[in-house]
Structure formats: structure tokens, C-alpha cells
Design a protein with these regions (language model features):
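Cytosolic regulatory regions of ion transport systems
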Residues: 1-228
Length: 228
């Protein structure tokens, strides 16, 4: 009854009453956005949101721009393509690709935060030096590597919710790894990746326990901290 009264007051004032609802699961959040809210009483502004998606956008999308500096692009966080990828276009409109650089995002922990970062990266990691006219093996793709000890089970659940991801994206290579970031072989791979001059490597630690996340982030192979 009290909510109805508030709605009535809002209708009298001809203002919408904002109603913000946090959806913890990204799949539920995606589904609710597709629903049509009943319009019998159009005095409510329904705004669903997801904490993890909001933070993913603050890190890497346009939401990452620092609003304190309106004169230029000033992100709060380094973009995934921290060396801008460019192409050259001649007067005839033909383009040539000089940059062989590519983004490689490694997400450790396929938690809610890890999944949100993954989905946001899929939205934004499309770069100018991908050329679909080249043979498949010569195309420069973004790589996203997802690492979790329980990946086999989690991947099945995730791909059930998002069944068409890989079939709709040609310029991103997705690697699901059922592995432990502390595994010596995995650490050797991280070291190798960090020394690749064309690979723009970003590692996001997203395990559910904050203390473990901090420990993992501070104890990666030394070469990762030494590089750009």
C-alpha cells in the first residue's frame, strides 16, 4: 500500500519514481532487460543493474573515461590495447596493416566478476588490424584465456546460458583452461606470453576470495612485472 501511495504521489507530480534493482546473475540481468514492463502506471522508471557488469565497464569501456577532465580522453585504468593499434588508409581508400600487436586478456577465476569481464571484453576487443580477407591462420586475433580449476563444469553451465558466443565472433579466440595459475607449466606459459613483443598482455585475477586474489596478483612470474 505504501508503494502504491508513493507511485500515486509521483503521478501527481508528473515525475517518474526511479526503482533500481540489482540482479546478481548476469544471465538474469540480461533476461530482465528484454522484458516489457506493464505500462498501466507509467510513473515508475525501472532500472535493473548488475554490480559486476558495471565494474567491467568502468575498467575498459567508455565508462572508464575520467569525467574530471572533459578536454581529452583520460581513462582511469589502462585500456586492454595500451599500445594503440592503427592502420594506414591511402587516397583510394585502401588500407594497409602495419601493426602486428594483439590483445591477450587472461582471466584467472571464472567467478561472477570473471564472467562479467569476459563478456565486456567480447564487446570491446575488436581492432583495426584484423583482416578477414587474409587466410585464417594469418589473421591477427584478440586472445582471451579463461583459467579456472573447475572450468569443465563451469564452461558447460556458461555456454548453456550463452550458446552462440563463439559462432558470432570471428576476430577473438577464446581459450577455456581447466588449470591452476600456480601450476609450474601454467606459470611458464605466462612468462612466455609476457616476453612476446607483439602481445599486449593483461591478467585479471578474479577468484572469489579477495585474500587469495591479492596473493595471486602479487606472486605472478617476475617477468610480468618487469615488462610494459
Amino acid at each position: 500500500k505504501r508503494i502504491n501511495n508513493l507511485r500515486g504521489l509521483r503521478s501527481i507530480e508528473e515525475h517518474l519514481m526511479p526503482v533500481y534493482v540489482q540482479f546478481d546473475r548476469i544471465s538474469s540481468y540480461s533476461s530482465i532487460q528484454k522484458l516489457n514492463i506493464a505500462k498501466e502506471m507509467p510513473n515508475i522508471y525501472f532500472r535493473p543493474f548488475n554490480f559486476h557488469e558495471n565494474w567491467a565497464r568502468k575498467l575498459w569501456s567508455l565508462y572508464a573515461i575520467n569525467n574530471n577532465n572533459d578536454s581529452e580522453y583520460s581513462p582511469n585504468y589502462e585500456p586492454l590495447d595500451y599500445r594503440p593499434i592503427q592502420i594506414n588508409i591511402n587516397k583510394e581508400g585502401e588500407h594497409t596493416v602495419e601493426s602486428q600487436d594483439f590483445v591477450h586478456l587472461v582471466i584467472v577465476g571464472f567467478s561472477k566478476m570473471g564472467r562479467a569481464l569476459f563478456l565486456e571484453a567480447l564487446r570491446i576487443c575488436h581492432y583495426a588490424n584484423y583482416d578477414d580477407s587474409l587466410p585464417t591462420e594469418k589473421r591477427i586475433r584478440t586472445i582471451i584465456t579463461l583459467i579456472d580449476k573447475d572450468m569443465e563444469r563451469m564452461k558447460n553451465y556458461f555456454t548453456t546460458q550463452f550458446p552462440h558466443l563463439e559462432s558470432q565472433i570471428d576476430d577473438i579466440k577464446i581459450e577455456y583452461r581447466a588449470d591452476d595459475i600456480c601450476n609450474p607449466q601454467m606459470r611458464e606459459e605466462l612468462t612466455k606470453w609476457s616476453k612476446d613483443k607483439n602481445r599486449m598482455l593483461t591478467i585479471a585475477i578474479c577468484v572469489s576470495d579477495p585474500d587469495i586474489s591479492l596473493s595471486l596478483g602479487l606472486n605472478l612470474p617476475a617477468s610480468i612485472y618487469e615488462n610494459e
